[in-house]
Amino acid sequence: MTSITIYDIAKEANVSVSTVSRVLNDTAPVRASTREKIMSIIEKHQFQPNAQARSLIKKETGTIAIILPDITNPFFPEVFWGAENEARGLGYTFFLCNTAGDYNRESEYLSILREKRVDGIIFLGGRINLQVCPDNMAQELMDMSRHMPIVLVNGNIAKSGLHRVYTDEGAGAAMAAEHLLEHGHREIAFVGGMKELSTTMVKVKAVQKKLREHGLEIPKERQLLGGFSIDDGKREMAKLLEQDNPPTAVICVNDNNAIGAIKSTIEYGLSIPKDISIIGFDDTPLASAVIPELTTISQNTYQLGKQAVDVLHELINQGKPKKQTVLEPRLIIRQSTGPAAR
């Protein structure tokens, strides 16, 4: 025997699916005669909504999605872990979308997620980290937000009004600079990232501001913005060490870069932190696994994911969470920083 669906009920009653939903969920007035007709058909067929029908009735699927640019970068799985644990505790299942840094793939996922009728989206990296996001990409995200709530993590779309959860990366970068200054460093460099990304430039600007308070600055030749991977950090650190007057300390855009910088420094026969200090950013699990253990800035990555889900859950349930949730960074001192060598 063929199962009766909500569509069959609507067809037999000659009404829309949404009208059947309103009757079942009692969410809005329905003419008494229409309600009686629908209820009579439901009783006749002994209709019991399945999961799909319940989602139509409630307009919820119990599924949320997270879009991120690089699952191999240790920062993003840590955020995902916090988000997934919180989501499962709230009864959601999770849809992971890894874009591999491809903006077109971001658009494809947005289209798929709308078709899947997920209840909401957490968005990391990609277009929301661009210093200037192209109008079409910004508009696409804003249009999507009219159909389902979206929470941005460590990023922004200017004038979009979208909810944000982020760590104050500028404050974290200033902490890194202050830590090195307290150890007597005056020759400081910055390695990693990309100039078109706000997550890079907010750190560079914060470091420069802190140094200028002490009458110092990072010259252009010591700002090597060459990517986010371990290999990128290794390559850019090698360039620094080839300079006539290498720095005594290096601030890296993330822990991956810092690990690459450590590898290069050791290959050059230098000692860390005796000859040069290196500080990372993020406090991923790799930071305490490398030798020497990495001094770094914690972004509270697990909490970023958890808080993002909490905000999204409140939006899904018609709540009014604050527009911005800001987490404070923390300096984690380990073995890779020490007094200046000169």
Please give the residue ranges for each predicted region.
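Residues that mark the start of a beta-strand
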Residues: 63, 185-187, 248-249
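Conserved functional loop/turn residues at catalytic and ligand-binding sites
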Residues: 5-8, 14, 24, 46, ...
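Alpha-helical structural signal in soluble globular domains
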Residues: 41, 82, 86, 140-144, ...
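N-terminal helix-turn-helix DNA-binding module of bacterial transcription factors
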Residues: 1-60, 205, 341
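Alpha-helical recognition/docking segments in bacterial nutrient-uptake
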Residues: 1-5, 59-178, 182, 242
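Hinge/beta->alpha junction and helix N-cap segments in small-molecule ligand-binding domains
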Residues: 69-78, 96-105, 125-131, 155, ...
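Flexible loop/turn connectors
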Residues: 236-342
